[in-house]
Amino acid sequence: MAQAKKGGTAAKKGQKTRRREKKNVPHGAAHIKSTFNNTIVSITDPQGNVIAWASSGHVGFKGSRKSTPFAAQLAAENAARKAQEHGVKKVDVFVKGPGSGRETAIRSLQAAGLEVGTISDVTPQPHNGCRPPKRRRV
């Protein structure tokens, strides 16, 4: 007869779970990746380590509602709130992608209480690299 396994937890015995420590980072960088389907906001320290992040899907939107400017606004506010718990007061913004939530996310970072320094567009431009997807015919 097969022995019945006892239900275990996600953390195994003897394995340490990583405790999230509060960092004190006054100046950081906000990376906003806005695609046609989603918007992801990551706030990092000057070395590039992620302090806080949020996305339209993480905030609770599904499907085509993730690509709306309102979803990007809520994601940016959520990420800014988490970053302020770590002491972030000023951010430089790096925006990437062609999505609709770019400007809204920057505005909501300011409205959430973060001081925005520089705004840079770091959208990758191909030097005739991969073939783009075919045109939509609706």
Swiss-Prot record:
GO biological process: translation
Entry-linked Pfam families: Ribosomal_S11
Alphabetic keyword roster: Ribonucleoprotein, Ribosomal protein, RNA-binding, rRNA-binding
Residue stretches of biased makeup (Basic residues): 13-22
InterPro entries: Ribosomal_uS11, Ribosomal_uS11_bac-type, Ribosomal_uS11_CS, Ribosomal_uS11_sf
GO cellular component: ribonucleoprotein complex; ribosome
Disordered: annotated segments: 1-32, 119-138
Skewed-composition ranges (Low complexity): 1-12
GO molecular-function terms, A-Z: rRNA binding; structural constituent of ribosome
Entry's family note: Belongs to the universal ribosomal protein uS11 family.
Subunit details: Part of the 30S ribosomal subunit. Interacts with proteins S7 and S18. Binds to IF-3.
Cited function: Located on the platform of the 30S subunit, it bridges several disparate RNA helices of the 16S rRNA. Forms part of the Shine-Dalgarno cleft in the 70S ribosome.
PANTHER family assigned: 40S RIBOSOMAL PROTEIN S14/30S RIBOSOMAL PROTEIN S11
Protein name: Small ribosomal subunit protein uS11
Source organism of this protein record: Mycolicibacterium smegmatis (strain ATCC 700084 / mc(2)155) (Mycobacterium smegmatis)
Organism ancestry: Bacteria, Bacillati, Actinomycetota, Actinomycetes, Mycobacteriales
